[in-house]
Amino acid sequence: MKILIKSRKDIERMSQTQFEKHTALISITDSGCEFVTLKYKPDYLLQLDFDDVDNDIFLDEPGHIPTVEERKVLECKYHMLSDEQALQIASFYYDTKDVISTLICQCEHGQSRSAAVAAAIMEFRSRRGISVFAHDDYYPNKVVFRKVLEALKDCIPVCDSNSRNLQNETKNR
């Protein structure tokens, strides 16, 4: 599977023609903003909105490690990637991984949130996520990376014997 990292402008330009068959797109926008305008849509599409806020929001007092409750309050206040959204990304990956040849991860500038999602998937698939962190064009959001990677590890694919549809269950943490 080819994994691409793109910006809003890149995707809007790409969508002026048909996407290649077997393409999936994880499209991320800022909270409260419109989703990317697609003239043509890929075979599989997941659209999410959350802001590009990283770990530094938790470092307001030197030596203070925020509690789980404090983290949740900050995550909500700053519209960060939620655990539920991370599970949506993991489920989307599991639901499409065997039927796609290209996965595109897109955010506003194609540098932080989309890079983090791509890095988490690459790390999960082949332990090559570090290549995104090492690339000069990207600055992966560490919160997004961590949450998506955890969701990928926690999300267990289960085949429903009646419908043969892929469903996901989460392990107890």
Where are the regions a protein language model picked out?
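Glycine-rich, flexible N-terminal cofactor/catalytic loop recognition
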Residues: 1-54
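Short catalytic/ligand-binding loop motif for oxyanion handling, primarily in non-cytosolic enzymes
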Residues: 34-36, 56, 111-116
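Helix-loop module immediately N-terminal to the HCX5R catalytic loop
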Residues: 46, 50-103
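Conserved aromatic-histidine-acidic binding/catalytic patches
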Residues: 77, 81, 105, 109, ...
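Recognition helices and adjacent regulatory flanks at domain boundaries
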Residues: 87-97, 108-111, 133-136
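Catalytic cysteine-centered active loop of the rhodanese-like fold, especially the PTP/DSP P-loop
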Residues: 97-125
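Cysteine-dependent PTP/DSP-like catalytic domain, specifically the C-terminal lobe
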Residues: 119, 123-173
